[in-house]
Regions:
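Conserved N-terminal beta1-alpha1 strand-loop-helix module at the mouth
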Residues: 1-224
Length: 224
């Protein structure tokens, strides 16, 4: 039985990889605007996102960026969601959420922000390894139990096709996020790894939805 599992492929740098992720069944694709080997310009992201189906959640990743710049970049790149991957305060997160439809707050496993993740009030919370954000590091998954009760928890940090089954079964997240774990080189995805990652994440998920949402979610809904 294939379970309900939100899957995001992050660190997209080119149209081929975005279309590959969508064809393989990803729910979301992510673009990095923070310093990284996978960093992309807003115009580049726009050229890719305008070719994607409306039901795909398109996400921009930022780290400790000014809320106004986050919002401006999201709009120029034609994205639907902002992922705040730094030490943003709840007030900064709220500023972004006023003008961006979906917001994901990333927290570090074992940190105070993770234990109090509900205070950010975001649509989704992503838990990453220390030094995460494409670093390919795995964290002690038992730390996920310390995270405040949030409606949609996305597990990241060193996930690969080889460990995603174990990760999903142990943590029972609402979704999973991968970047370097499905690459053949920095910024270039490996089609076989992408396919196996998505397939195994869904096979490991419980057949019933986790959390308050029915799956799949309609990311094309702009009524807010």
């Amino acid at each position: 039985v294939i379970g309900a599992m939100f899957v995001k492929i992050c660190g997209i740098t080119n149209e081929d990889d975005a279309l590959l992720a969508v064809a393989m069944g990803a729910d979301a694709v992510g673009f990095v605007f923070a310093p990284s080997p996978r960093q992309i310009a807003a115009q580049q992201a726009y050229d890719i996102t305008r070719r994607l189906p409306p039901e795909i959640l398109t996400v921009g990743l930022f780290r400790d960026e000014h809320p106004e710049l986050v919002v401006d970049t999201i709009h120029r790149a034609g994205l639907k969601a902002a992922q705040l991957h730094g030490h943003e305060s709840p007030a900064m997160v709220e500023e972004v959420a006023k003008q961006v439809r979906w917001v994901i707050k990333a927290v570090v496993a074992g940190s105070p922000d993770a234990r109090h993740a509900d205070r950010f009030g975001t649509d989704m919370v992503l838990v990453d390894a220390p030094g995460g954000g494409g670093a390919g590091k795995v964290f002690d998954w038992t730390l996920a139990a310390e995270i405040a009760d949030v409606p949609r928890l996305i597990l990241a940090g060193g996930l690969t096709p080889d460990n995603v089954t174990d990760a999903v079964q142990r943590v029972r997240p609402w979704g999973v996020d991968v970047s370097s774990g499905v690459e053949k080189s920095p910024g270039r995805k490996d089609p076989l790894k992408v396919r196996h990652f998505i397939q195994r994440a869904r096979e490991a998920a419980p057949p019933l939805h986790v959390g308050p949402d029915e799956m799949p979610y309609d990311w094309a809904d702009d009524d807010w």
